[in-house]
Amino acid sequence: MVSTEDFDYNLPEELIAQTPMIERAASRLLVMDHETGALEDKVFYDIIDELNPGDAVVMNNTRVLPARLYGVKPDTGGHEEVLLLNNTHDDEWEVLMKPAKRAKVGTEVVFGDGQLRAIVTKELEHGGRMIEFKYDGIFMQILEALGEMPLPPYIKEKLDDPEMYQTVYAKEPGSAAAPTAGFHWTEELLQKVQDKGIKLVYLTLHVGLGTFRPVSEDNVEDHKMHSEFYRLTEEAAATLNEVKQNGGRIVATGTTSIRTLETIATKFDGEIKADSGWTEIFIKPGYQWKAVDAFITNFHLPKSTLVMLVASFTGRENILNAYQHAVDERYRFFSFGDAMFVK
């Protein structure tokens, strides 16, 4: 049995980054050799030295929705907070509602001055709800006007500029949380990467809030993964296959890029093909990696599936040792924190 406790570590609260770096690429970078566990302290700008001509850097171009809405129930005047999780079909969404116990099937909630309304259509097992939106106009424009950016619960500070909770290449709206390893990239640094003969490849995975959920079950096998929508285009798949054939490495930016590529490679017997769908892949120790050769990732929450994902590539001892080093050296942790490059 793989125990959840095996992926716990002690993190002083003051190391949880509360604000983004003004200069994105000035964050620190802990470089790790996944076989030996050897560590090097660098700055994210130095990532260019870690990449070779002929490699491909893969990034998730999802855009975070202003997914938190505050509304009123017209029949009682009661307040409801609605957090969008997944757009399952047309105007139907899977959401979390607070207070949930008052959100029965048929409950109506009105947002703003009434330009957006929602009806609860179903109660879900995990406490969530299915709702259907009614509105006049373009949904995304209304959401941009009424919604708030849903920052992770461990970030207590208000964000001055919501764009700092997006990557510089975010363009496909649909996430409830950002693919945070991508925060460190700047347009200037990506240009330098390209100039060095490295391919830039974009895919889409819409990040759900399950990303932040610690594993509550003692036995890792009992944990149920959340489902997330992904897409890889023909063009992106062709570039990645060409890179692989020519001996280059596929370098994933973040766990969302990893999960997309490994989902596809698992589905097609190790091959990378254009594909879209929903993934519940749980990458944990014992998993055989099929597509990704190296990756950039932030420092993740204790006992989270993301620590387990990294451990499946590096070995548990190596990753816990790296995290202890990061704590000792006062690295910044979680969404707005520093990065690792695992090779």
Swiss-Prot record:
GO terms for biological process: queuosine biosynthetic process; tRNA wobble guanine modification. It comes from the Bacteria. SUPFAM superfamilies: QueA-like (SSF111337). Its EC number is 2.4.99.17. It is an enzyme of class 2 (transferase). It catalyses: 7-aminomethyl-7-carbaguanosine(34) in tRNA + S-adenosyl-L-methionine = epoxyqueuosine(34) in tRNA + adenine + L-methionine + 2 H(+). Pathway: tRNA modification; tRNA-queuosine biosynthesis. It is found in: Cytoplasm. Monomer. This is S-adenosylmethionine:tRNA ribosyltransferase-isomerase. The gene is queA.
